[in-house]
Amino acid sequence: MNLTHINEEGRARMVDVSEKAETKREAVAIGSIYMKNETLRRIHEGTIKKGDVLAVAQVAGIMAAKNTSHMIPMCHPIMITGCDISFNLDFENSKIDIKAVVKTVGQTGVEMEALTAVTVAALTIYDMCKAIDRDMVISEIMLVKKSGGKSGLYEREV
């Protein structure tokens, strides 16, 4: 297998995408944060002392998508044309499901931006609720869809 992020000397490099065609690209990532029922109820009711947990997590996820290249060394800075973070409060399983949809028109995909958005949104929920629930678990972060570019459509069965 040929690793594109390794140069001839075996050192890390950023892949040159200058010859790639610009195409419309989209990536969708999901993840979950499990918590106590009481924590989920308080998020839903808006009674967490630090504020509106989901509003802050939504903004944090968007900011994270926009700043992915600052956190992951080999990611290209990308002009994101759209980013949407959504939440589903699952009271039966005592968790919040997080979904990020990131779009661009460019020479490289936005998979890492979508994954980073979900991760940081989950971390923000953890941060805002840790005073009442240190048993929260962030898990199941994965790419579920990618479209555009040479490799075309990828969809994970979930």
UniProtKB/Swiss-Prot annotation:
Enzymatic class: lyase
Binding site for substrate: 74-76, 112-113
E.C. code: 4.6.1.17
Record pathway: Cofactor biosynthesis; molybdopterin biosynthesis
Catalytic activity line of the entry: (8S)-3',8-cyclo-7,8-dihydroguanosine 5'-triphosphate = cyclic pyranopterin phosphate + diphosphate
One Pfam family it belongs to: MoaC
Source superkingdom: Bacteria
Active site: 127
Gene3D superfamilies: Molybdopterin cofactor biosynthesis C (MoaC) domain (3.30.70.640)
Keywords linked to the UniProt accession: Lyase, Molybdenum cofactor biosynthesis
A GO term for molecular function: cyclic pyranopterin monophosphate synthase activity
GO terms for biological process, alphabetical: Mo-molybdopterin cofactor biosynthetic process
Assigned protein family: Belongs to the MoaC family.
Function: Catalyzes the conversion of (8S)-3',8-cyclo-7,8-dihydroguanosine 5'-triphosphate to cyclic pyranopterin monophosphate (cPMP).
Subunit structure: Homohexamer; trimer of dimers.
Protein name (database record): Cyclic pyranopterin monophosphate synthase
Record organism: Thermoanaerobacter pseudethanolicus (strain ATCC 33223 / 39E)
Organism ancestry: Bacteria, Bacillati, Bacillota, Clostridia, Thermoanaerobacterales
